[in-house]
């Protein structure tokens, strides 16, 4: 028998798939959320300590007191994750820091542990819980600190160069050439000064010294000529210093001293200027002589300074081989020259640089100095004079054609700031603010009794951390529609945020796909719209190194033997540029050598065919190019990229269904993405399952300890979907660390299951699938195939008001007993009650504003106490479209010790659960960007059926395929049908999946027709349709855009204050805008009365609409409309501009426009239904009250009279 296509692979303990992959996986996928967890772990282990060491010790102004850092520790968290969620608190641990205060006068030392506030902790899932809600800190993609060179063309078309030294924090140093070939520098974006002025200010004053250092060049001569010695009384250095000071502080008196201090503070003070580790690494790398000298011709003989033997002769071309012999000498400081700056320079320490003379590529006769910065250690975090001189040298060399310009969009020049670093920067800001306070307190307070505790004010530190988690652009409310959305959110890279780009300033280049993204950032997954290309996703195998650069793994190719080894090297983008990398699908022999002599490979931005002896590395996997969500699309290679982008983005919006089903046609990514997402319940230790039920799983470890795992049931996710876990292990089952114990939402047997496998036919039907609409069988409704559970949270708080506290109660004015039937004695809805729109959830009354009481009422108040005070009903009611079943009620009170915000006495939260079946108007999609709206749900019996009588589930429009070029859906359809017939699951990994032949082979194996099409019969008549139709199984998902959330109609609602027109939008219970073009339509139709009422009663004729309502209620004819409010606003606007504007009628008599006064307030905010009811009851109450007051008055008068008589 012929062997079947594909081979069986096991995913987790519970699922086997037939995989069509041809390439064996050399490397396991890393943990997909390690970018979050590792970064935060680094912060706790090292980052925090670094901060304290940076800021402390703090000395007072006289240098007598010094506050030093000893150690820090995080204590036990106050709440567990679950408690923090329930109490709306932060999941955080108290940070305690041990500090030592030394008094240098007395030698006294005091050590003390100081509390530094609560520090938010990361959960195991890579999220933070802030105020009870899960948040994710998105990693930021920023320009790396370092030195950059760029070409520029001025308006006359003359080419020039520019350079920038960018620190992590501190002043930028820029250099540029002008049209006259003069080089200038700018410090921190101020006015430019000639380059030589800065060199002189650094202490190298004379022209001779400058030419000695840099060598001769045209630009340098022009610059020196421009920079004349103006004031003979100053040395050249002092004059240079004054020139610099004038640019930085224009208008202030300039002295050499103040300039020295300024430059020192700007560039050489570690507190104000910081290159960071990464900046120092990038500067040393860019100014490295080993790369700069490659392929140049030496203009001097290089001699070993120790032995005196010649290393390389003059005139030698420095090829890679020559460079290899030379490299160790350069590293040891070959040709080092030490220059001594004059005493009045900014930095007086001697400066050592390496100078090697080469011939200019533009003019082989001329010698050029190439200056290296002498490799300062990585501990030197500020810029040194040697760095400035070496970068100037690089800049001048560029004009000679030596060196190359940088591409700022290259991932070698962009780095990632993850959680740890973002937090560290924020913490540093807090500590720096605190430092000021500490200094002040040191000088004010009595030194004898001072303790560290008294010096420290932790407010700024706490505030900066709180601000970061609460309101930073990078701290985001987690997208929790389903586990894939959660996972993708944690792996997101944003170029926006503080220190990043802004949407408006970002051009095309930044947003575009760059060759260096390969294996580092996904070229597919990015949002559509204004953020396209600014928000990206990390590729599946990518890691972030200690400098923040993204690395991707490659298999090393042994150059000697030509074998592809299993040794994996992680390369950053700039290192990869030096190598040639073969593609992952290059065929290999058994022994690991290439099967062909020529392979497809990449060298920088080129795709080449190269001979195998030139190949250095090979890709580890075909899916290393794309992100996790993209890797979940089968037959991705057959889809157009725009549609694949939509497919990747829409999978994140899939709503978790009641009984999820993993795809029959998967990619093999389903298990890993579900496992790492944080939504599944994972086993922490090996053991045996001892107890399983819906709410708890217990595992007995091999060492006898018992682990208990709580299973989450129906928790509301951030997006209002139901997060529910279901155990998939059974009693006595042996489990290992990392096994899935319970499926989370949108998971089945440990695999991601976002949708359902349904029988799909590509055919039109009565025009119901026009414009991508979807026709669906009623079976999908009846069998709850696309039914999802949604939980909404409503809250009501009882506050203290000026007029007295609000009260949660069952006694609500003007509400019948029937409306209170489901409220308990406190006035809170019972769990399990079924509620409709407008039903009471929490009864609450608020004291009404008491107007100035009359004498009689004051007397009454004195006699009868509180009775006379009115309250109004401010109960929590179910909003429109919010009906369902009460799932849970949480009550928080001060007495119970819950932390409530100031002024709140009680908080009630009600959770209402809805079971939503699929509906016309719901949005559905496949995985290939093929989205549509359900247009008709038809009875099963009317759907077209297969020859064996099976009715199909969904009909899609065949016209949606060719123009969109997402052919992957058709291949999925056929392979899915074959999988259904064979009763198997298949895996077709991206770029290495089932080929055309594999699909047809499987189709044949399943016994389907050779074209995989079938004849369909009309369900209504039983007649066959004309052509053969493609029918198969496609994985379709229901998206979060559901019609229940969008359907909306206004009855009586709020009006805008100024124009008095109805508000817009569902949230405001607004109306539909009847705009200019709609008015034209009614005018064209001649519907004058309809138009009149739309522009008056239904909109902003304030008096008219109230009168109309009353007329409808009383059954009287509707009165004539008045003048719309917006017209009055327009007239008043013109009057306010000083135009005498009046409105006249036909007879030229003036129409009076009503003027607003205080009485109109209630007229404006009309909520007519309740208002009418209130008026009626108010009249009755007034009548009763008046009668009562009259009776009381008679009694009182009588009592007075009696009393007077008695006195008489």
Swiss-Prot record:
Instruction: Give an example GO cellular component term for this record.
Output: DNA-directed RNA polymerase complex
The coiled-coil regions, if any, are none
Q: What class of enzyme is it?
A: transferase
- Tell me which UniProt keywords the record has, alphabetically: DNA-directed RNA polymerase, Nucleotidyltransferase, Transcription, Transferase
Q: What is its EC number?
A: 2.7.7.6
Pfam families per record = RNA_pol_Rpb2_1, RNA_pol_Rpb2_2, RNA_pol_Rpb2_3, RNA_pol_Rpb2_45, RNA_pol_Rpb2_6, RNA_pol_Rpb2_7
Q: Which cysteines are joined by disulfide bonds?
A: none
Q: Report the record's Gene Ontology biological process terms.
A: DNA-templated transcription
**Keyword Cell cycle listed:** no
User: Which reaction(s) are listed as its catalytic activity?
Assistant: RNA(n) + a ribonucleoside 5'-triphosphate = RNA(n+1) + diphosphate
Can you name one GO molecular function term for this protein?
DNA-directed RNA polymerase activity
**PROSITE patterns registered for this protein in UniProt:** RNA_POL_BETA (PS01166)
Q: Which family does it belong to?
A: Belongs to the RNA polymerase beta chain family.
The record's listing under PANTHER family reads:
DNA-DIRECTED RNA POLYMERASE I SUBUNIT 2
Report quaternary structure and partners. The RNAP catalytic core consists of 2 alpha, 1 beta, 1 beta' and 1 omega subunit. When a sigma factor is associated with the core the holoenzyme is formed, which can initiate transcription.
Q: What does this protein do?
A: DNA-dependent RNA polymerase catalyzes the transcription of DNA into RNA using the four ribonucleoside triphosphates as substrates.
How is this protein named in the record? Answer: DNA-directed RNA polymerase subunit beta
Gene name per UniProt: rpoB
């Amino acid at each position: 028998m012929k062997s079947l296509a594909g081979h069986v692979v096991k995913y987790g303990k519970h699922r086997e798939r037939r995989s069509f992959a041809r390439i064996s996986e050399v490397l396991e996928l890393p943990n997909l959320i390690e970018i979050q967890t590792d970064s935060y772990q680094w912060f706790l282990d090292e980052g925090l300590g670094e901060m304290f060491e940076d800021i402390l010790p703090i000395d007072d102004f006289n240098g007598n007191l010094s506050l030093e850092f000893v150690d820090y520790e995080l204590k036990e968290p106050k709440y567990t994750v679950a408690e923090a969620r329930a109490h709306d608190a932060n999941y955080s641990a108290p940070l305690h820091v041990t500090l030592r205060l030394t008094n240098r006068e007395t030698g006294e030392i005091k050590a003390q542990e100081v509390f530094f506030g609560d520090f938010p902790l990361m959960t195991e899932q890579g999220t933070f819980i802030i105020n009870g809600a899960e948040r994710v800190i998105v990693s930021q993609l920023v320009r790396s600190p370092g030195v950059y060179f760029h070409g520029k063309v001025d308006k006359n078309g003359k080419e020039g160069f520019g350079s920038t030294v960018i620190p992590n924090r501190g002043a930028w140093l820029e250099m540029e050439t002008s049209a006259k070939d003069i080089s200038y520098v700018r410090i921190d974006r101020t006015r430019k000064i000639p380059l030589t002025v800065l060199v002189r200010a650094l202490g190298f004053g004379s022209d001779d010294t400058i030419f000695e250092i840099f060598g001769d060049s045209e630009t340098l001569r022009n610059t020196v000529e421009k920079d004349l010695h103006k004031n003979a009384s100053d040395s050249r250095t002092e004059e240079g210093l004054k020139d610099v000071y004038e640019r930085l502080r224009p208008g202030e008196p300039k002295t050499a001293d103040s300039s020295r201090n300024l430059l020192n503070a700007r560039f050489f003070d570690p507190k104000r200027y910081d290159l960071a580790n990464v900046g120092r690494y990038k500067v040393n790398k860019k100014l490295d002589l080993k790369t700069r000298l490659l392929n140049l011709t030496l203009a001097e003989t290089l001699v070993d300074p120790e032995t005196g033997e010649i290393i390389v002769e003059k005139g030698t071309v420095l090829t890679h081989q020559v460079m290899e012999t030379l490299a160790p000498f350069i590293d040891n400081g070959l040709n080092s020259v030490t220059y001594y700056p004059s005493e009045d320079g900014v930095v007086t320490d001697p400066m050592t640089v390496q100078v090697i003379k080469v011939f200019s590529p533009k003019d082989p006769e001329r010698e050029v100095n190439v200056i290296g910065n002498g490799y300062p250690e990585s501990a030197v975090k500020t810029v040194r004079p040697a760095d400035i001189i070496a970068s100037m040298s690089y800049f001048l060399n560029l004009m000679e054609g030596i060196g190359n310009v940088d591409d700022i969009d290259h991932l070698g020049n962009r780095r990632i700031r993850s959680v740890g670093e973002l937090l560290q920067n924020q913490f540093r800001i807090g500590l720096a603010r605190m430092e000021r306070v500490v200094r002040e307190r040191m000088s004010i307070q009595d030194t004898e009794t001072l303790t560290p505790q008294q010096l420290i004010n932790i407010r700024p530190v706490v505030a900066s951390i709180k601000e970061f988690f609460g309101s930073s652009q990078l701290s985001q409310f987690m997208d929790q529609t389903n586990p894939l959305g959660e996972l993708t959110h944690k792996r997101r890279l944003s170029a926006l945020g503080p220190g990043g780009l802004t949407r408006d300033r970002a051009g095309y280049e930044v947003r575009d796909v760059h060759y260096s993204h390969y294996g580092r950032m996904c070229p597919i997954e990015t949002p559509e719209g204004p953020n396209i290309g600014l928000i990206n996703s990390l590729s599946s195998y990518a890691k972030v190194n200690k400098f923040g650069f993204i690395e991707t793994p490659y298999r090393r190719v042994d150059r000697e033997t030509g074998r592809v080894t299993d040794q994996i090297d992680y390369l950053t983008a700039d290192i990869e540029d030096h190598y040639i990398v073969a593609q992952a699908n290059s065929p290999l022999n058994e022994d690991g050598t290439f099967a062909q002599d020529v392979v497809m490979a990449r060298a920088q931005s080129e795709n080449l065919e190269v001979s195998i002896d030139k190949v250095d590395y090979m890709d580890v996997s075909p899916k290393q190019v794309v992100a996790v969500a993209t890797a979940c699309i089968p037959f991705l290679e057959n889809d157009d990229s725009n549609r694949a982008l939509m497919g990747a983005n829409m999978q994140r919006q899939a709503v978790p269904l009641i009984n999820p089903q993993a795809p029959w046609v998967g990619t093999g990514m389903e298990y890993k993405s579900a496992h790492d997402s944080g939504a599944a319940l994972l086993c922490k230790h090996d053991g045996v399952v001892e107890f399983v039920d819906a709410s708890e799983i217990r595992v007995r470890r091999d060492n006898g300890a018992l682990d208990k795992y709580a299973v989450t049931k129906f928790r509301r996710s951030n997006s209002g979907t139901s997060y529910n876990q279901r155990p998939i292990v059974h009693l006595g089952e042996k489990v290992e660390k990392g096994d899935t114990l319970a499926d989370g939402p949108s998971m089945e047997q440990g695999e991601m299951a976002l949708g359902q496998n349904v029988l799909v036919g590509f055919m039109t039907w009565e025009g119901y699938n026009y414009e991508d609409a979807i026709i669906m069988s009623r079976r999908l409704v009846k069998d709850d195939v696309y039914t999802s559970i949604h939980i909404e949270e409503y809250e009501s708080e009882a506050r203290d008001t000026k007029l007295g506290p609000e009260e949660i109660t069952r006694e609500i004015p003007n509400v019948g007993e029937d409306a209170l039937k489901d409220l308990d004695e406190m006035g809170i809805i019972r769990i399990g009650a079924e509620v409709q729109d407008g039903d009471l959830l929490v009864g609450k009354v608020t004291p009404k504003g008491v107007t100035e009481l009359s004498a009689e009422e004051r007397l009454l108040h004195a006699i009868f106490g509180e009775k006379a005070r009115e309250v109004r009903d401010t109960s929590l009611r179910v909003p429109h479209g919010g009906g369902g079943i009460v799932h849970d009620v949480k009550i928080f009170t001060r007495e119970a010790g819950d932390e409530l915000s100031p002024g709140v006495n009680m908080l009630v939260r009600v959770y209402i659960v809805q079971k939503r079946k699929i509906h016309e108007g719901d949005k559905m999609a496949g995985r290939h960007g093929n989205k549509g709206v359900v247009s008709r749900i038809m009875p099963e019996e009317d759907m077209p059926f297969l020859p064996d009588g099976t009715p199909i589930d969904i009909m899609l429009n065949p016209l949606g395929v060719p123009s969109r070029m997402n052919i992957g859906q058709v291949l999925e359809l056929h392979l899915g049908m074959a999988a259904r017939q064979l009763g198997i699951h298949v895996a077709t990994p991206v770029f290495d999946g089932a080929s055309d032949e594999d699909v047809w082979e499987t189709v044949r194996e399943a016994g389907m027709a050779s074209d995989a099409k079938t004849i369909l019969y009309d369900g209504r008549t039983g007649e066959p349709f004309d052509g053969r139709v493609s029918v198969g199984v496609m994985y379709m998902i229901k998206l979060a855009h559901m019609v229940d959330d969008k359907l909306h109609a206004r009855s009586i609602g709020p009006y805008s204050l100024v124009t008095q027109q109805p508000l817009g939008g569902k949230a405001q219970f607004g109306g539909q805008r009847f705009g200019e073009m709609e008015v034209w339509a009614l005018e064209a139709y001649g519907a004058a009365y309809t138009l009149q009422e739309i522009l008056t009663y239904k909109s902003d004729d304030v008096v008219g609409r109230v009168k109309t309502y009353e007329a409808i209620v009383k059954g009287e004819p509707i009165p004539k409309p008045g003048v719309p409010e917006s017209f009055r606003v327009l007239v008043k606007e013109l009057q306010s501009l000083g135009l005498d504007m009046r409105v006249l009628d036909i007879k030229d008599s003036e129409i009076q426009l009503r003027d607003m006064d205080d009485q109109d307030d209630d007229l404006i905010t009309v909520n007519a239904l309740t208002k009418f009811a209130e008026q009626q009851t108010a009249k009755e109450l007034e009548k009763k009250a008046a009668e009562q007051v009259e009776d009381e008055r008679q009694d009182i008068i009588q009592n007075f009279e009696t009393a007077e008589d008695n006195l008489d």
